[in-house]
């Protein structure tokens, strides 16, 4: 009986800690948007992630999206990347 009680209490505590950590992690993402020459079809999200990682070395980017913007004489791509907020 003691073992079952300890098991249930530890299970509930682990569940609570994990659920709180998920909420904190979800709230700590910030966006950074940059415009780069070129087209998203060439490298897409991987190119945006590589550019952002090289430019902002202290930030760890989680994911990026790439959007093409067609102008008169050239195409630009907008990289919208999510990274963990500092502070």
Swiss-Prot record:
Localization terms from the record: Secreted
Disulfide bonds: 30-85, 40-66, 48-79, 64-81
Keywords, comma-separated and alphabetical: Antimicrobial, Disulfide bond, Fungicide, Plant defense, Secreted, Signal
Signal sequence extent: 1-26
CC terms in the record's Gene Ontology section: extracellular region
Single GO biological process annotation from the record: killing of cells of another organism
Main location: secreted
Pfam family, one: SCRL
Family designation: Belongs to the DEFL family.
Protein's name according to its UniProt entry: Putative defensin-like protein 231
């Amino acid at each position: 009986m003691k073992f079952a009680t300890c098991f249930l209490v530890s299970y509930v505590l682990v569940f609570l800690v994990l659920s709180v950590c998920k909420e904190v992690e979800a709230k700590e993402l910030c966006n950074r948007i940059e415009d780069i020459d070129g087209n998203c079809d060439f490298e897409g999200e991987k190119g945006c992630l590589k550019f952002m990682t090289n430019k902002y070395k202290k930030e760890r980017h989680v994911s990026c999206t790439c959007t093409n913007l067609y102008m008169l004489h050239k195409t630009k791509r907008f990289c919208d990347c999510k990274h963990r907020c500092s502070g």
